């Protein structure tokens, strides 16, 4: 069947904001697909609500709509654009669910829009638990005994019949949302009640738990002519029972016999054929380690997180091929873009091993529930490639950026045996490190396999690493052993530790004895055919396949795994920087370790090195490539943290230099710079111990804002009210030291705003000023930002522009910088300066049409703003109002408090744009899934300091028809001021307390603030987590609630009696 000529215009749905379970892999898939469809000559219309994506750039599609991914908005765009077809399989669960809604609402039929790729029947059969069960029965594929339930009672009677443990899986949800393993009736009641609420079709599957089986995944493709192939097989290190997104994964499978592999492979191909999927599909299976029996766990009839991993692991571009299949091309028509000679029908073969490790947010959320289960918790992932399992596993550990350079966590050697075993049995995010510690203590791999059901093969690899450590201790400075340790992935740092020397000495020793890495190509065909991909990984072998080109090159360091505080925004900037390097006539080389992103798509750069972003690995590439220099500005804190070591090693850093980076990051130098430039900042001091901290706080006066120096995303940042709180902060939150002092600032309660500026050293371009809706005290990444500013006087804006120019020139900034200001009584103070690209770059680039990262890169490569046609100063404002709103993943993270403060908690962002502030706010709230009806009940439970302000909001809510409920203290205050409210209990287990009313669906929103004292308020935390569980809008900052109120008021007609 040939390419379809009866369709001209295709709409692609993106996946919206990044949340746990749906991250940057969909930006990668969507970008690939849009470009592939344009390549085939189709007109592409893209809809996505997330501005921090490459796919929402104007060059990627013919028309780009950054609008909420809701039925109402997408229907309007469909009516306006009238596309011939819709491709929903690249937008994750969001895209699939929207396609189902559009179909059920009759919109697709009304407009004659055809669904491409996966038929609706297949989405239904794969996602609807009942239909899936029927299909598997017809195919004779075994699935665990299960029952579809729509009530809690139904679940309990089925569990009693088959016995516990059972697994609960809500239908049509993402990343295991609302699911879990239940070992008793009480747990089952809780999980099913919640799961039924979260499932859009109020349906849960209760199934026999097969926890402990091997979890195997196959990434399969099929075309309309029924050609099908397996792109990649993957094996989870962790057995069934832990969500695959939270598991360590190896590709290809490592422990299956040929018979087992063929058995599961055939089952996967039978399933994709039966579902008639045209495109990519992911099949998850459970294999009994002691027999040939297996079960089908689930099928994702779309591009997924696993397909991004499979694409990067094999070099086979799944999303690109899936998009072309959707328009009628066949696998045996298309050339494999990697080899250029073989066809896409040719199954990839790997002559290396790939390890994926999940990146968890528990460095940010120390109170979070770290136990792993069927609900996903990781925010991102890293991938490493090597010739041996030990090698790729250790490289992946280094890539995580959690302060480890080996499979070893500091401090575990002091943990008791009892605690060690408990940690190993109940898997947490750091189980790998506990397993390694147990092996160092002499536990046998058989004992550990008995406790964990992890295959002996994998545990034996961990044991081999431990044996090598012991050998190294016994034989210091043995060159043969050094070579062997490097072949198995040991870092110079780890070898230095075992030989009691420093990493630099090991590096010198290696170079003296020519123990150097070579770079191998990822070519999809195990070197069987000649391949053209510039995609490399390091290993300690003989033949080097990466040849330095004749052209002068520039290396850009990526930002590593996605985590809270360092998201896809930095990858966006990296990709744009590469475009500018190429446009300036240089060869662009990317180094990065994240398989989900666009930057690690090998077609983006001239060369891609898939490596950990550590000094050792970066230096190895620099020594081979001999670049003009390295750009660090776009890789977030990851890259900036390498500046000092690289500068000392004589590597040319392009853009802002180390001493100027230090002047922005080092407290004393920064204060001096501000003083010299005549720019005010909140009074502040530094402290290296508790006594100094108390002395500093007394001098400045409470409340103070405390934080460690050199961090991203406000990690361990707090507003402290009194001396007791400060003492506890110094004891628990930070390890202060002379090298890493704690910063203590006066906390100014004012309006916050921020600026991204681009400087060539002489002139400074300020694309725009963003005003935050939440006042100072809420992290800038968690605040709603408005552009252009709505409430800043001309005088304040002029002052911001003046200070920005002075800072950029005074700090010798070349390229990007981000400055945050706080404004109190028309006085402007600088809070912080980051001499690098920030997370607002994509948003501002979109709303001003300035490709900021490209402009900054051109300046770094010696052009001027004038050369590029930009004026000095503030760029003319847009006529529309644009809002950047944060999106959170609290529903996935039990025990994490959703109260907003100076520590960043959001995982993603959306954008809302319109002619007025109210309309833009409405879109931003809709896009971030904060939907409030036009009437209902709102609960106020407010701290004393905020009551007067909350009263004004309560009066306005009452005026538009909301019923106001309040907890005791708040209700009494309202009554004194003449406002009637209905009294509601906080938590007390009665039928009229907040959690009970939330469960009954009788509350539409909650406003809950905590006083400046931020006392450990257990009640408040229970109320907040109940609201999150029930999906009820929760506001912990009055400013956000006031913004929502403006929207509701703007949608309400006034009704007055005459």
UniProtKB/Swiss-Prot annotation:
Region (Allosteric domain): 930-1058
Cofactor detail note: Binds 4 Mg(2+) or Mn(2+) ions per subunit.
Stretches for region Carboxyphosphate synthetic domain: 1-401
Positions of the UniProt region annotated as Carbamoyl phosphate synthetic domain: 547-929
NCBIfam families cross-referenced by the UniProt entry: CPSaseII_lrg, PRK05294.1, PRK12815.1
Listed PANTHER family: CARBAMOYL-PHOSPHATE SYNTHASE [AMMONIA], MITOCHONDRIAL (PTHR11405:SF53), CARBAMOYLTRANSFERASE FAMILY MEMBER (PTHR11405)
Protein name (Swiss-Prot/TrEMBL): Carbamoyl phosphate synthase large chain
Annotated organism of origin: Streptococcus equi subsp. zooepidemicus (strain H70)
